[in-house]
Amino acid sequence: MLSYRKSQRVLLAEKLKKKNVIHVFGASGSGTTTLGKKICSELGYTLMDTDTYYWIPTEPPFKLKRSANERIELIKNDINKSANVVISGSLADWGDELIPCFTLAVRIEMKQSVRMERLLKIEQAIYGSRIEPGGDMYRQHVEFFEWAKSYDSGGAEIRSKARHDQWQKKLSCRVLHLDGEAEIDEKFKKVSEALGLFEERT
């Protein structure tokens, strides 16, 4: 017989299969959250960004990590409470338990130069002078940018193209590849087509 805890996991997995769970992933700055917000705005889905689950809220932010098990449980509980969801960000290396839940994966790819320009604008808009020389987040900002730049050339031990290539091979759902520089409406249209929704919305 299944243990109570294991049987509960099986029941939850079956329940999660009955809804759309879209995983949007790619390099930092490639627009995964932007596309996730667009999908949720248009289709009424719930947006779940992996950073929300990965990091414990601190000031300054991004200092303390949750354990992988805690992240997984929080994500599964939030999926269970929602009708349909988009999970934006990276789950590679710690989110394998969620793979059976996915009904569609969307991989966004973008040139490094464009990504880094977008990231700088985002960081400046959120943190302002805090990331400038002398600011309390300047060192953290510099380290973050060095990490983000390494996506295209880094090994599978970090969040990189190599790691996402490995992660993608594990996915059993359809994987849609999108150009991050395409217009947001064009990207949403392709997601809608992949979901079989576009004709119903035109």
Model-based region annotation:
Residues 69-113:
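Glycine-rich phosphate-binding loop used to anchor ATP phosphates in small-molecule kinases
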Residues 2-18, 146-202:
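NTP-dependent small-molecule kinase module
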Residues 24:
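Hydrophobic anchor at the beta1->P-loop junction of P-loop NTPases
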Residues 33:
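Walker A/P-loop
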Residues 37, 41-80:
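Conserved substrate/cofactor phosphate-moiety recognition/catalytic segment
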Residues 30:
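ATP-binding Walker
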Residues 27:
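P-loop (Walker A) phosphate-binding loop of NTP-binding proteins
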Residues 109-159:
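A glycine- and Lys/Arg-enriched "phosphate-lid" helix/loop adjacent to the NTP-binding pocket
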